[in-house]
Each structure stands twice: as C-alpha cells, then as structure tokens.
Swiss-Prot record:
This is Elongation factor G-like protein. Coiled coil: none annotated. GO terms for biological process: ribosome disassembly. GTP binds at residues 16-23, 80-84, 134-137. One of its GO terms (molecular function) is GTPase activity. Residues 80-83 are annotated as: G3. Belongs to the TRAFAC class translation factor GTPase superfamily. Classic translation factor GTPase family. EF-G/EF-2 subfamily. CDD domains: EF-G_bact, EFG_III, EFG_mtEFG1_IV, EFG_mtEFG_C. PANTHER family: ELONGATION FACTOR G-LIKE PROTEIN, TRANSLATION ELONGATION FACTOR G-RELATED. The keyword Cytoplasm does not apply.
Length: 669
C-alpha cells in the first residue's frame, strides 16, 4: 500500500510477559496474512522480529522490532515488544506511538500477576488495548477462572468476544459471541463454521448476555434494547466495541493458540474492525490528521545499524517527504520496516511508523517537526536498579569506550553510565543482570570492545569516635639548606555529614602564615586514605602551635610535618568504618509484602514503613534504609520473590558505621 490513509492504518503493539508467545503470535500473523512464505520459529532463530545475535542466543526479544504488512486493504504496523521486565523501556517507548496494544498472556492463573505493570502503564497512558489469551490448547485452568484472574489486574472491564470449545482437554474451536457462530480450528488453515455444540448452549448464552450487559454500561440505546428484550443487531455490537475500545473504556478478550495458528485470523478481524485508526490517538494529543499543519513526528526508538543511525518514528501530523528537513536536519531517507529489512519510500503519511535515516543528535523521545512546535510527551527513562563496573579488556580501548557507551545509551535510555569519582570505576547501570549482559555483548559486537566486568566497589569512608592532640616534626638535613617543620594538631570528630574542617589558632607567628596552607595540604592528603584505608570524613583538625627555622622551613616541610602528625594521631582516635546507606522505596503486590519485609531485614535494612499504593489497587510501597553493600543483587532476589514484578527506586541518603562483625573483612588490599 503506497500511501495509506488514516482509515486504512493500524499501529499495533504486541506486548506481554516473557514466554507468553508474542513473537510466535507475530510469526503466525505474518504467515496467515501471506506476508511470509515460511513461518519462523524462535528455537530455529529465524523469526522476523528477533534478528539480533543477542535475541537469538537467549530465544527472547531484547528490543522492539517492526513488521509492517498489507492485509485486507489495510496497512498494519506491528511492533513486537520485549516481554522481560528488564527491557520494559523498549516496550513503553513503542507503546507511546501505538494506536492499540494486544496483550498476549498464557491461560494460567499463576502468571496473571506478571501482567499488572503492563496494564497500569496502558491505563496511565490511556492506550486502547485488548487481550489475546494464548496457549489455550495447554490451559492450566478453565477459561472462566483465567478470565476472573485477568479482571483483578485491569482497571477497565474485560469483555470476552469468544468462548472456547473443548473436547475433553483438547481445544477444538471457539464460539463468536457477537454472531453466535461456532468454529472448528484447523492447524495451518482457517477455522470452519460448525453448529453450536448443544452442551455449550447454556454457557454460550450466559457469556453473551454478560458481554452485552458490559457493553450496555457505555451505550444507553443498547441498555434499552436489553431491558426490552430486543436482540441488538450485529453491526451495533461491533460498533460499540469499536467506539469503547477506541475511547479506552473496555478491554476486549479473544483467545487462541498461536503456535498452531488458532485464533489468529479472528484476532486480525478484530483489529481491522475495532482497533482505532491513527486519527483517534492523534486527537487525544490535539493534533490534526487531515494533512494540514506542519509535519510532527516523534522518535520511538533509536538504532545504530551498519548503515548508520536509524530513528523509528511515528508521524503524528502532516505528510513527511524525502526532501524535508526535521529539526533543522535534512532527512537521509524514509524507510518502511519489516524486521531488519528496510524499504525506501518517498513519503510517509500521517499515522505511519517508519524509519528515518541519519538524523544525528536526535534522541529517543524527541519531537521532530518542520516547524517550531511544543514537544510531545514521552515516557521517562526507567531508574537504574543494577550496576556493573566495566573496563575494556585492552587499555588502549579506554579512549573510545565513552563514545560507544554514549551510543548504547541513545539506543536504550534505561541504560546509564558514570565515571565514579570515588572509586575511579566506570559503572554501567541498567535494569538487571540480563540487560547488562546484552549491553556488554553489543559493545563487543557493534563497537569491537571486548569488556571485563565486576561488582562495583562500595565507596566506604572512615571517621573517628574521639579526639586527640598530636605533635609532628619533620627535620631533614642534606648539607646546605635542610627542611624543617614543626606542628601541634588537635583532632576532633564532627557530627555526621559535616565533612572536614581545618582551622588554626596560631599566636605570635610561631608558624608563619605562608606555611599554614602547607599544613592544611598535608592533613588533606593524609585524610584521602586514613588508617583503615579509606577516605576520612566528619573530622576537624586545628593547628594550635608549632615552630619554624628561618632558613630550613618551607611550605613543603610543614606539609610533611602535618602528615607525620596525622599518621601518629589518627590511630589514637578510635577510627571506624562508615558505609553508604541508601533510601529505598520498594513497590510490590500486597500479597508479597511480608516476603519483601523479610528480604529487606535480611539485607541489614531498616524498615521505615509501608503503605498501600493510592494509585495502584492491591500494591504496596515499602520505605527502607539499606546499606549500598547489600544492594548489588537485591533486584534479582526481589523479582524472584514477586513473580518478576517487584521493583524499587533508590537514592543516596547518609553514612553509617559498619557493624563491628563486618568491619574486619572490609580492609582494602
């Protein structure tokens, strides 16, 4: 389709937890729509969307991939999104540009909670969505139980359009609740219409009535028809689904088994008939889709390909032409995408999702336009929860590491990096262990930078518990001018958080003013590595007395004298190790809160309190102080306890004495 119109476009994000079958569903969509000659398989590594070595090696999606197809006189752009929570940034960015999301889930009550963060994001951003219950041929529980569980994680009413037909435990087909037509599945081909099984007539009637009553909550005319026992026409029911889905008021539910292509054609029919076209989502942003006004687009994802930078963008307003300039830059090309295939086109109409080539210094989330316009909203980068200290295998590569890391962060905004000024390490931050492993593999594959990694060092400090007075004298004679410095210092502890203070109470010029900076310099140099091997904080040092020699004294000599005094005096001050304490806020489903409290306590944490989330039913927030030393694998353990959905944010808070039983093991090498 050369120039699709609003009415003939659908932008559909396929989302869901890891292992729910999203990529398999997309492969089935491509197969039954005639878009591929052979259906790919994740195990064989030949799917359209998972083409990167990192995805193939793990048999999981690690970045969003686009597959645009023409089907039934429509242009459908499918965005296959990662399911792992560690790659949620990819999913959220893609959803901002989608018109509809298909939530793929398993027919397994125990896995329903993994959908909760996804439902909340869709609700918060008012993105229309429907549910495809996958793997119905291997359902763990009856359809009704799965549906009830799904309702517990959605703030919108879930309304099934289909009802499954089983023979024993074998999935045979489904009943379309709108038309009341039953169908029998066939692997690899379309389902055939069959007579409605007599034993399901009662269940079908009840399910259909519940569907109509749910729709009637949003349609007074339909409500009147039901009250008067008038059978609503099929077109009216379909129109209600289309209108309420487009307004993000309901969540239609369909079912199938993508591995066998069951339910895929009906899903496509639902997307064609009910999914909103681009004008609906654009209207929410007060944008015009009639072709008037300047071009407005937004970058949903940034790729660095062998051919250069490629920006995945949604055209929100206007028609983009190959000769246009966006944000002052001339386009390097417009491409329609099908996995890693790029097809050049001369124009992209409003609503399309396309690749834009070689737009330099344009980041993910950037609003692009041919005019000066207000930036469109975009999802914020996820805060980091897991870090590694990294370095190139070869020191000669250190120079190009920062450039490569910059590009890595542009591709994935949920990655960040820093040069830690205290430990001198380069720290790469992300969303989990797999997330960072993939990032390191990309550094090696894309930028020829083999890396080594380890847990980041904890920036311990030390302080003192009591004060002392100490004398330091430096005297050195070499023939000719010697060196002489003589100081008396008072060392005292300060309140936590007061850092370092230096003062002097010299009377009568016993230490000339020009030498006092040398004393302070000597003290500061010593405090960079105290008696326990770490920087010293919360300490006050006062120069109280001393003496000098007219010929042999110098600033350098007084610096040495001060160092000698500190070296002698500090061990007398009962030095103690301090560790950084983080302020941590953990988000967890209420049913796991007690486990989370135990986890925090088991990591030497101090629980400050917990409460129900006001913006998220059946979820709690736990506030705590935790030692940084206990946080390296905290996210891994938290997710293990909470079906992968627990999360936390953190920030540095204060320093605290290390318990005596841990301190002896923390001396640096």
């Amino acid at each position: 389709m050369n120039n699709p119109t609003n009415e003939s476009l659908r932008n559909v994000a396929i989302v869901g937890p890891y292992g729910s079958g999203k990529t398999t569903l997309l492969e089935s969509v491509l197969w039954v729509s005639g878009s591929v000659s052979r259906k790919g398989n994740i195990k064989d590594g030949n799917t359209v969307s998972d083409s990167s070595p990192e995805a193939k090696a793990r048999q999981m999606s690690v970045e969003v991939s686009v597959a645009g197809i023409d089907y039934e006189n429509l242009r459908l752009n499918f965005l296959d999104c990662p399911g792992s929570i560690e790659f949620a940034q990819e999913t959220y960015g893609a959803l901002v540009g989608a018109g509809t999301a298909v939530i793929v889930c398993e027919a397994d009550v125990s896995r329903v909670l993994t959908l909760a963060p996804l439902f909340k994001f869709l609700d918060d951003w008012a993105i229309p969505h429907l549910v495809f219950i996958n793997k119905m041929d291997r359902a763990k529980q009856p359809f009704g139980e799965v549906l009830q569980a799904l309702k517990s994680v959605s703030s919108r009413p879930l309304i099934p359009q289909q009802y499954p037909i089983y023979k024993g435990e074998e999935l045979q087909g489904y009943i379309d609740l709108i038309t009341e037509q039953a169908y029998q599945y066939h692997t690899g081909s379309a389902a055939d219409p069959i007579a409605l099984p007599a034993e399901l007539a009662g269940a079908e009637h009840q399910a259909r009535q519940e569907m109509l009553e749910a729709l009637a909550d949003f349609d007074d005319r339909l409500l009147e028809e039901l009250l008067e026992e008038v059978e609503p026409p099929q077109a009216e029911i379909e129109a209600d689904f289309k209108q309420e889905l487009g307004a993000d008021l309901i969540v239609p539910v369909v079912l199938g088994a993508a591995e066998q292509d069951f339910g895929v054609r009906p899903l496509l029919d639902v997307l064609i008939k009910e999914a909103p076209d681009p004008s609906v989502t654009a209207a929410r942003r007060s944008l015009s889709t009639d072709g008037s006004g300047p071009v407005i687009a937004q970058v949903l994802k940034t790729y660095f390909t062998p051919q250069g930078r490629l920006s995945l963008a949604r055209i929100w307003q206007g028609t983009l032409r190959e000769a246009d300039s966006l944000n002052g830059q001339r386009l390097g090309g417009i491409y329609r995408l099908f996995g890693n295939q790029q097809t050049p086109v001369q124009t992209a109409t409003v609503g399309e999702i396309v690749g834009l080539a070689r737009l330099e210094n344009i980041n993910t989330g950037t609003t692009l336009s041919t005019a000066d316009v207000k930036p469109l909203p975009f999802v914020e980068p996820l805060p980091p929860v897991y870090g590694l200290a990294i370095a190139p295998e070869q020191r000669k590569d250190e120079v190009k590491l920062s450039t490569a890391l910059g590009k890595l962060v542009e591709e994935d905004p949920s990655l960040t990096w820093e040069q830690n000024t205290e430990t001198q390490e380069v720290i790469l931050w992300g969303q989990g262990e797999i997330h960072l492993k993939v990032a390191l593999e990309r550094l090696e594959r894309q930028y020829k930078l083999p890396m080594v990694s380890q847990q980041p060092q904890v920036p311990y400090k030390e302080t003192i518990r009591k004060g002392t007075e100490v004398h330091g004298r430096y005297k050195h004679q070499t023939g000719g001018h010697g060196a002489f410095g003589d100081v008396y210092l008072t060392i005292k502890p300060l309140e936590r958080g007061n850092g370092f203070s230096f003062s002097e109470t010299i009377v009568g010029g016993v230490v000339p003013k020009q030498y006092i900076p040398g004393v302070e310099m000597g003290v500061r140099e010593y405090l960079a590595k105290g008696p326990l091997g770490y920087p010293v904080v919360d300490i006050a040092v006062t120069l109280t007395d001393g003496s000098y020699h007219n010929v042999d004294s110098s600033e350098q000599a007084f610096k040495q004298a001060a160092r000698l005094a500190m070296t002698e005096g500090m061990p007398q001050c009962n030095p103690v190790l301090l560790e950084p304490i983080l302020s941590v806020n953990v988000t967890t489903p209420t049913e796991f809160t007690s486990r989370v409290l135990q986890l925090v306590s088991g990591h030497r944490g101090q629980i400050l309190g917990y409460e129900a989330r006001s913006d998220w039913k059946s979820w709690d927030q736990v506030a705590a102080h935790l030692p940084q030393a206990e946080m390296q694998n905290f996210i891994i353990e938290l997710r293990s306890l909470t079906l992968g959905v627990g999360n936390f944010t953190w920030q540095s808070d204060h320093l605290q004495e290390v318990p005596d039983k841990f301190a002896p093991n923390l001396r640096p090498d």
